[in-house]
């Protein structure tokens, strides 16, 4: 309602829309009736297809004036290499079985991380319903200091653990100081070992 009342743009980052684990279909905001001039969808080849380094994405809107401005900006900028554009376009020819297989694998990995985290006292988190990462509050005062300890001092048979302190994901200062972001992008055994190290 605020979008219409104040004539705002509603941006929707939909790069993970295929990676929802409950079986439900995620609706695109482009499907909202009456918001055609307000909705702007962002998509990315690198995230959708795990194509790290493919700096190709798109902006989608039914707002012709906005898209005209976007095209002017795009024409003034250098673009991605032609070969990368061709390769990225080919990725969109994959069938739904690709996303089903990737989704199933990420769900297995998520379930492994959740199962192992539940064994650790004092960790607080929500089980993600999509994407391939989760945020967790650790029973520490400062996740960044804990990360430095893990990298500089901790060693278990030559292994340690690296994660992303979550404070930088928040706009409000001092929020998420004891939180970490973990991406479950490695195999099951490595995930189990990582949770053991944590």
Protein language model regions, located:
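PLP-dependent class I/II
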Residues: 1-198
């Amino acid at each position: 309602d605020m979008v219409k009342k104040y004539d705002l743009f509603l941006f929707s980052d939909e790069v993970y829309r295929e990676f929802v684990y409950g079986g439900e279909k995620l609706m695109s905001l482009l499907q909202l009736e009456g918001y055609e001039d307000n909705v702007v969808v962002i998509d990315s080849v690198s995230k959708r297809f795990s194509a790290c380094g493919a700096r190709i994405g798109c902006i989608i809107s039914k707002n012709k004036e906005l898209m005209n401005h976007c095209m002017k900006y795009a024409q003034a900028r250098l673009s991605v290499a032609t070969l990368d554009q061709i390769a990225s376009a080919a990725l969109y020819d994959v069938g739904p079985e690709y996303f089903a297989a990737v989704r199933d694998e990420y769900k297995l990995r998520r379930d492994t991380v959740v199962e192992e985290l539940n064994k650790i006292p004092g960790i607080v988190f929500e089980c993600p319903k999509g994407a391939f990462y989760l945020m967790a509050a650790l029973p520490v005062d400062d996740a960044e200091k804990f990360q430095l300890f893990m990298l500089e001092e901790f060693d278990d048979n030559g292994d340690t653990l690296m994660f992303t302190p979550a404070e930088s994901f928040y706009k409000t200062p001092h929020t998420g100081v004891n939180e970490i972001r973990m991406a479950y992008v490695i195999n099951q055994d490595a995930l189990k070992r990582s949770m053991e190290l944590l």
